Swiss-Prot record:
This is Somatotropin. The modification Phosphoserine is found at residue 131. InterPro entries: 4_helix_cytokine-like_core, Somatotropin, Somatotropin/Prolactin, Somatotropin_CS. It is found in: Secreted. Pfam families: Hormone_1. Belongs to the somatotropin/prolactin family. GO terms for biological process: animal organ development; cellular response to insulin stimulus; growth hormone receptor signaling pathway; positive regulation of multicellular organism growth; positive regulation of receptor signaling pathway via JAK-STAT; response to food.
């Protein structure tokens, strides 16, 4: 491995291992750039894990000839489509940082319940770690987003609890077609929602701290 890649890998690992700052009275404040770097790395990691699991599930359970039609049917399935959140980078750039943080928080919190059923629904080869680990990763990202919100609080009106309905739990019975399609749809939404959260965080980081990695 090239020295530059090895160094970059160590830096990314070190950032992922950093704790989020607690109350200001207990710990010194972390620079805003580090808060954003931590949040983006965690969101990227979760999004990649979700995408890999979706692909593994698809490969194991969904016949190739049926995937396209099923994916089209899933287009309006995600509850997150009911909130007025940006659908891509261009739309996200039109929103304030606080708006994007609040949307990101809503997306993350909507999955805190369902992911606790992951290990019961799938075999170990299909699940990225255990459900407890996924839950902990989501909670960690939630905490990081909340830390950013505290730093950037600007007195603007809150988005509010727009996502009234959370996602259902994953079905543990994989013998029926209905259960398979339900879990397939949930994994698709999980992947989409984490991609949105990652996009929002990267847009905010890039417009605050101009860097070469801002093209995505």
């Amino acid at each position: 491995m090239a020295a530059g890649s090895w160094t970059a890998g160590l830096l990314a690992f070190a950032l992922l291992c950093l704790p989020w700052p607690q109350e200001a009275s207990a710990f010194p404040a972390m620079p805003l750039s580090s808060l954003f770097a931590n949040a983006v790395l965690r969101a990227q990691h979760l999004h990649q894990l979700a995408a890999d699991t979706y692909k593994e599930f698809e490969r194991a359970y969904i016949p190739e000839g049926q995937r396209y039609s099923i994916q089209n049917a899933q287009a309006a399935f995600c509850f997150s489509e009911t909130i007025p959140a940006p659908t891509g980078k261009d739309e996200a750039q039109q929103r304030s940082d606080m708006e994007l943080l609040r949307f990101s928080l809503l997306l993350i919190q909507s999955w805190l319940g369902p992911v606790q059923f992951l290990s019961r629904a799938f075999t170990n080869t299909l699940v990225f770690g255990t459900s407890d680990r996924v839950y902990e990763k989501l909670k960690d990202l939630e905490e990081g987003i909340q830390a950013l919100m505290r730093e950037l609080e600007d007195g603007s009106p809150r988005v509010g609890q727009l996502l009234k309905q959370t996602y259902d739990k994953f079905d543990t019975n994989l013998r029926g077609d209905d259960a398979l399609l339900k879990n397939y749809g949930l994994l698709s939404c999980f992947k989409k929602d984490l991609h949105k959260a990652e996009t929002y965080l990267r847009v905010m980081k890039c417009r605050r701290f101009v860097e070469s990695s801002c093209v995505f």
